[in-house]
């Protein structure tokens, strides 16, 4: 028994799911912009400054009896006159905290740590982590990352327009925007709820997602083009459905085998790679979904709407003449 699956018949459902996901993502980024003046919670990589993370020394008797309070640490930081700052309590036991401030020199950092120790108790020197990035470097990293994204989008449009046609490229880019927006929306929500910050690794993840998604879309589009050449009389809806059926197993298998190591990294990897892996997991799932259910159905809808014949290239005409 052959499994027949039609993406065209349920395309309004697929588009509705994507529309809801995109609207939710825009909403989360809007709330984040209202609260943080940025659509995502930026790390030091982008805004510059100093971040100090340290834990209480629980080997000292009674030092970790009471959990840390954000307000207590915030008052200490404010009294040091270091400017606007952000305090986060980390871990379930609430014995670790981080403080992010404008850029501090060595003396200012030492005074701040001394003041914190006198207020909240002994700090474990082995857990002190200090990161400092200048504001100019942060801006340069952000600009370079955005430029890389724009160049990748432009390159994809040019490549797909040459290999296929412009409408193929247009809907492939629409699918990529879908993947990037949904991934960013999830991280906007994580930034609001859990204080998750995005750094330069997040931009690397977005570029990787773009590459994965466009590759998946090209596989389906290539099958559509070949089927159009072989069956010129078929309706574009039939061709797209048949093409998706032919490539569905490949798309699912590729996505699953890619996700397995990423899930392992997310569950067992270090804190640096955890959210990088999560971004890739979300993006790859979205990329597979958009390639199968969004890019292909949009192409069929557009061709039907404009009354374009299914033949995509002169090459198809030549094949017919030779036969």
Swiss-Prot record:
Its main location: membrane. One of its GO terms (molecular function) is protein-transporting ATPase activity. The keyword Chaperone does not apply. This is Protein translocase subunit SecF. It comes from Picosynechococcus sp. (strain ATCC 27264 / PCC 7002 / PR-6) (Agmenellum quadruplicatum). One of its GO terms (cellular component) is plasma membrane. It is a multi-pass membrane protein. The lineage of its organism: Bacteria, Bacillati, Cyanobacteriota, Cyanophyceae, Oscillatoriophycideae. Pfam families: Sec_GG, SecD_SecF_C. Part of the Sec protein translocase complex. Interacts with the SecYEG preprotein conducting channel. SecDF uses the proton motive force (PMF) to complete protein translocation after the ATP-dependent function of SecA. Belongs to the SecD/SecF family. SecF subfamily. It is found in: Cell inner membrane. The keyword Nuclease does not apply.
């Amino acid at each position: 028994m052959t499994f027949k699956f039609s993406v065209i018949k349920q395309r309004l459902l697929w588009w509705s799911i994507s529309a809801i996901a995109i609207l939710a993502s825009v909403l989360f980024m809007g709330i984040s912009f209202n609260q943080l003046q940025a659509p995502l919670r930026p790390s030091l990589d982008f805004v510059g400054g100093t971040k100090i993370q340290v834990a209480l020394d629980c080997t000292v008797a009674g030092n970790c009896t009471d959990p840390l309070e954000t307000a207590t640490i915030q008052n200490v930081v404010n009294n040091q006159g270091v400017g606007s700052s952000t305090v986060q309590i980390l871990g379930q036991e609430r014995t670790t905290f981080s403080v992010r401030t404008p850029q501090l020199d060595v003396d200012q950092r030492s005074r701040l740590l001394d003041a914190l120790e006198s207020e909240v108790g002994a700090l474990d020197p082995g857990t002190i982590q200090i990161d400092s990035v200048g504001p100019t470097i942060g801006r340069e990293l952000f600009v370079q990352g955005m430029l890389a994204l724009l160049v990748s989008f432009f390159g994809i449009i040019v490549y797909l327009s040459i290999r296929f046609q412009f409408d193929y490229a247009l809907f492939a880019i629409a699918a990529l925007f879908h993947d990037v927006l949904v991934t960013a929306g999830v991280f906007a929500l994580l930034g609001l709820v859990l204080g998750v910050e995005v750094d330069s690794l997040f931009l690397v993840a977005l570029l990787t997602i773009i590459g994965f998604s466009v590759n998946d879309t090209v596989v389906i589009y290539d099958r559509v083009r070949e089927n159009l050449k072989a069956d010129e009389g078929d309706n574009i809806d039939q061709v797209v459905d048949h093409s998706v059926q032919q490539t569905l197993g490949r798309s699912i298998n590729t996505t699953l085998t890619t996700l397995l190591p990423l899930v392992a990294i997310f569950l067992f990897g270090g804190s640096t790679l955890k959210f990088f892996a999560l971004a890739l997991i979300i993006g790859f799932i979205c990329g597979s979904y958009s390639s199968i259910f969004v890019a292909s159905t949009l192409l069929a809808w557009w061709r039907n709407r404009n009354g374009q014949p299914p033949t995509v290239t002169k090459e198809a005409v030549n094949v017919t003449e030779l036969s």
